[in-house]
Each structure stands twice: as C-alpha cells, then as structure tokens.
Amino acid sequence: MAKKKKILIRIGSLRHGGAEKVLVTFLKNLPKDKYEIDLLLNLYSGKYLAEVPDFVNVLYLNKGEMITTNRLQDIPVKAFRVIYQKVLKIFPALLYQYILKGKKYDVEFAAIHGFRDEILDSPQKSSKKLIWIHNDLKKTEFHNYTDEEFRKFFGFDKIMVISEKIQQDFEVLAKNEEEK
C-alpha cells in the first residue's frame, strides 16, 4: 500500500462562509486511505465543525467563540488570542514544534488567502505550498493588496482560484509562463 500524503490545511475557523463550506465539502470528497490531514484552525468554532470527516485531525490555537465586541470582560481573552497568534506567526518554528509536534508535511495548504504568509513562512521548505483564493483581492475590504503584495502569492507552488476574473488578475501580474 502506498504511503499516505501528509497534508496541513490552515483556515481561521469553520464559523460560516463560502470558503469554509467549500473546504468541508472538499474534505468529505477526499479518499481517506490516501491522505493524512491535519486541519489547523486559529479558533475552534463554527457550524461546519460537525461536518468535518472523522479521518481529519482537527487542531486549533484557541477555543471558544469569536469575540467581536470590546466589552471590558472580553478584552483579556481577546488580547491573549491576538498576541498568541501573532507570536506564532512571527516565530513559525514554535507552531511547528509545539502545536504540530514536529510533524513533516508533504503539502501545506492555505484554504483562504488570509493564510498566505503563514504557509509561505513555514519552516518546512520541502513541502508543496498551495493556496485557494475565493475573493477578488482587488476588492477586499480587509487588506489593500498592492501589486507587490499580490506578487507574494507567486511564492506558492499552486494557486487555485474560483473565478476567471481572479485568474485574469493573476495572469496580468505573472512575469513568465511558469507563474501563469
């Protein structure tokens, strides 16, 4: 029997949204005898958690509901979460050693564009890096992607997009056929 491919998938949570639903549907359609999957969530929460197949190992950085207010009683937990995640982003070796227990992956996959840097900054240089882009990055409200920021996505081995418009945006910025 062939050795299972080890895959790490990163996403913020499984709270709601199209990307989260697409990811869970994708996981349900993978053959469990071919893949060993670790799904790393920043926040263990969401309506799609119950739909994750049993063969997927769900890991998380924080547990509980997303804190969307600045109520006084919520600030310490919110601050801890932000600082903890920032430390792990700045020092990814800590994440891979202590949360992922030194596991080596064949593939590291950003299920949404917001995890671009986390995957590209992985200490596991030999893994294939994939990203799934679900949004028109020229219109995102959370981040202003300059051409330079956009070009960082070409650090991935494979960029998967959900529309022709997004594909065209990347092709315009591609500097050679390999990037296209």
Regions inferred by a protein language model and the residue ranges of each:
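Extreme N-terminal starter segment of soluble prokaryotic enzymes
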Residues: 2-8
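N-terminal strand-loop element at the rim of the active site
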Residues: 9-16, 29, 33-83, 171-175
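Short beta->alpha connector loops
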Residues: 15, 42-45, 112-116, 136-139, ...
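An aromatic- and histidine-rich active-site surface loop
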Residues: 88-101, 105-126
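Membrane-proximal helix-turn-helix segments that form the acceptor-binding/catalytic region
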Residues: 94-104, 142-161
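A short, histidine- and acid-enriched strand-loop-helix "catalytic/donor-clamping" loop
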Residues: 115-118, 127-144
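A short, active-site helix/loop in glycosyltransferases that binds the activated sugar's phosphate group
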Residues: 117-120, 156-180
